[in-house]
């Protein structure tokens, strides 16, 4: 004879979930992950608000190479600029897979962020690099709305040594612990 339930000799047809304490087929369970996930609008707002992203690529010895970078969000994508001969560029030339982390909050109940798995696309065209450099500078410079004179000349001098990198999201995990309402 087969296995018995609760010492009975006959099999009782039950689904495994009926044995969980508190199970109710009429009340759908919401996972914590779904509860704290950012909506598309919340994610875009976070990317607009925050100023530093941690960009991680695979280093030459196979370990993560993570660097803080200023960035510009463009329609859900992350763009940065860096020196063309930097380690992160060498890493992304070898393997374009990257993870970009944008987060904020000091206390657990304040934590909010997104971990974006992405494919990196390196742009070397001087016009593209310069246009992006201007956009990045305007995002971070306070009190200016246009680049002129010495500021523009400085960017033009740096652009030939730089690249712009576009991170196209493949998968995003996000969280906003404020949505937990103090319960953990």
What are these model-derived regions, one by one?
Residues 23, 27-38, 111-184:
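Charged, gly/pro-rich active-site loop segments
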Residues 32-53:
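Short, basic/aromatic recognition patches
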Residues 50-84, 92, 99-104, 112:
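Short beta-strand segments
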